[in-house]
Amino acid sequence: MTLDEAIKSLMALQAKLAAYGHAMGLLFYDGATTAPKGTAANRGQTMSILSEEHYKLTTGEETVALLEFLDAHKSELDEKQQRMVFLLIKDIRNMQKIPMDEYVAYQQLLVEADDVWHRAKETSVFALFEPVLEKIFETNIRFAHYCAPEKDPYDYWLSEYEDGLTMAQCDEFFATLREHIVPLLKKIKAQPQLDDAMLHGHFPEEKQAQLSDYLMRTMGLDLDHVGLSTTEHPFTTSLGSHFDERITTHYLEENFASSMFSVIHEGGHALYDTGSADDLAYTVLDGGVSMGIHESQSRFYENLLGRSRAFTGFVFPKLCELFPELSGHTAEEFYRAINKAEPSLIRTEADEVTYSLHVMVRYELEKRVIHGELKVHDLPGEWNRLYKEYLGVDVPDDKHGVLQDSHWSGGSIGYFPSYALGSAYGAQLLRKMRETVDVDECLKTGNFAPINAWNREHVWQYGCLKKPGALLEQALGEKFDPTVYTQYLEEKYGEIYNL
């Protein structure tokens, strides 16, 4: 085999893997959006066949031989090809350590789990979900021991979502956040609370859908390649490549802001994915490099931009056009309403100040279940206890408590810290962006092009070419510093609440 032939085979291999990913991703997307309730077993059967073929292709002798050959000639490969080989070898080595029957069974389990989670949340009965969730945790622990027996299993999964991340780093990061957020929240509680009554009323889903379309276009999303559907828990997924991006939302007719910021959040994910350089499509370099960087983009658009005074001033006339009952209010009142800081039950609805406390609850619970210090059966009670301790709220039922997120049903254990990290990454990226982009002026006029161009140049275009830490440091021109985020919160909410 010549090197040129091997490189062609490398590209063909990745295209095949992307095709399997496309098919399996469509099954997941369908199950979470429009599939009839009784079709989970049918999708699970298809998923088991596809995942087995995907496993065989990934770990097959021909694939292994190809990558060993390319690895032996890596000095003759360009930067992108070297990174492709590195990531594929990493995936293969991990997958080879997991027995195929267990891998296939797990993929089938996740299809079942999504269906069971929906039913459990709908009825607010954790006991329905408990047996499946127990299997998911057990499987994640077992797979971590297979892949990295020398590592703590929770460190392994944290690192899978954010390369190199450890519990020690998370503990230090969260301690820094708590040091600033807890006293800030205490000061806010001592002030007269903001009025957010204008956000509550009756806002027809049809009008909210028009708002979603308007927001997506304003953000600069290409609607020929980005689609929007409804689901129980909003998410974003790429299908096959960054040329097909699907985002989802959930409309609450009593609160338009819920979907508004969900669409902006998921739109941030979609901008990142679709911003990958086109020559990365159908390769392992396509799309976001880590969930922390991904969440830096989603929460950047949702909060740093979407909840800014500049953007709310721009978007408010459109809101009044769609929802005439808002016309008796001002853009400043809207800005203050959407930035009301108050402990609450639902993570996705949380304000910027309390949001990280929601993440910390999930981090502590995952860590303890993984380490055998907490039984899955006891998750609801411990969830409720920590919400009372961290946020001072009483959880009324499982639907508004332990069942609110879809992550565990999807096997995403170790994902949650990425949300808090992403928020902090985003604040530092915004500070850097302001050196060359008049962000407020862009937002006042609804012109996202300069903002998107900066993100594309410094973050999006690279896909998975660089490690997340290196990508972030290159974009920032300095080391990551979480106090940039806490300073942002203190300044913003200090002004809003006259602290």
Give the predicted meaning of each segment:
Residues 1-163, 490-499:
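A well-structured
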Residues 2-3, 22-25, 32, 38, ...:
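C-terminal, non-catalytic "cap/extension" segments appended to globular domains
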Residues 10, 148, 265, 298, ...:
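Divalent metal-coordination and catalytic microenvironments
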Residues 10, 258-277, 295-299:
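Active-site recognition of the HExxH zinc-binding catalytic motif
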Residues 42, 102-105, 132-135, 173, ...:
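Secondary-structure capping and boundary motifs in well-ordered enzyme cores
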Residues 106-258:
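Contiguous, non-catalytic segments that form substrate-binding/exosite surfaces or channel walls
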Residues 174, 178, 205-209, 215, ...:
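All-alpha helical catalytic cores of prenyl diphosphate-utilizing isoprenoid enzymes
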Residues 287-328:
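Post-HExxH zinc-binding segment in Zn-dependent metallohydrolases
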